[in-house]
């Protein structure tokens, strides 16, 4: 049954690992508990995204060969990384300002959990496309939507746990979640299976197979896919990382939590909606052109109206800013869900897990550059002023939009001129 063997295990895996995006819920609590600045602790999240992409790139061949081994590795490393993070938070609470505690969190949350993220993200994708051959976009969108929706589902639960578990709630929460997510992922691992009768194409070696597959098209086309994927993630992370402060700038600080949940739903909806829509199109690259067009138009409107810098609380400007946030979140999610199916249309299903894994290295580098780029711009341009009772830099946030608009335009050019249309294989 394609739902039991494909869709449900994919959701169990992705709804677990997708909670990595709940980082902002507890990052300040970790920093306060172990006695370090929030900036120092933030690197754990950047490392997690980096190793997500790199582990997907390096373990793509393993996923291609044995999804049961890769999904088991994902279950163990993700849960172990969570439990290890809890341990080093506990250690830091007993030994404030301990470098060992900080480095332990980097290794546990960043490296070990990052391996679980990459292998867990990749493991069910090809299997879903094999089960849903006529609706590959809908199938992968459903699973990847689970990754995006995980934040909306888990954030209120984590917030309640932090307050309800009393003293030391931050490290207790990680212990509990490690157990819960291991059970979910292990069940997903047990029931995940490719369709009966599917035989992997034989190649002389893993690398030879990937290289030969990529050579079936001009390499410029693959470079274009990689770069536009990278740019979409970089711009998405840059804007999403400043989302909370942008919302406060337009006078909606009290509703920041609700807006964050709605934006997470747009993220998940974009993953499902754009990929399902792409099933009806001749060329899935059209979806990326649509994503980049919507992103450019929404950022330009906010820039031209100075919607963030104008803090007067104009209702129309507030609508423009909220539309920008929701559109960017939807496009960010849609970019992820369409990559595996776009690659399968160009290169076939033979080495799709390995090629998808290599392409996810773009996520690794975007995880390091997106947030950091936005932070650098906000820190070094404009100035912090009192806005609705909080210190914010409206001009800095506007400048982030200027840079992302330019990058979105570059991505549009890549999509139009470098990524060639292909008939589906």
At which residue positions do the language-model features occur?
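A late C-terminal transmembrane helix in Major Facilitator Superfamily
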Residues: 151, 346-383
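Hydrophobic core of transmembrane alpha-helices in multi-pass small-molecule transporters
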Residues: 81, 96-119, 230, 316-334
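C-terminal ends and interior cores of transmembrane alpha-helices
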Residues: 77-97, 294-313
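Extracytoplasmic gate region of multi-pass secondary transporters
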Residues: 23-28, 155, 220-275, 336, ...
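Intracellular juxtamembrane helix-capping segments at the cytosolic ends
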Residues: 30, 119-132, 139-140, 334-347
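Helix-to-loop junctions at the C-terminal end of transmembrane segments
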Residues: 55-67, 271-283
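C-terminal transmembrane helical hairpin of 12-TM major facilitator-type secondary transporters
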Residues: 263-266, 273, 280-342
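Helix-loop-helix hairpin linking two adjacent transmembrane segments in secondary transporters
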Residues: 147-196
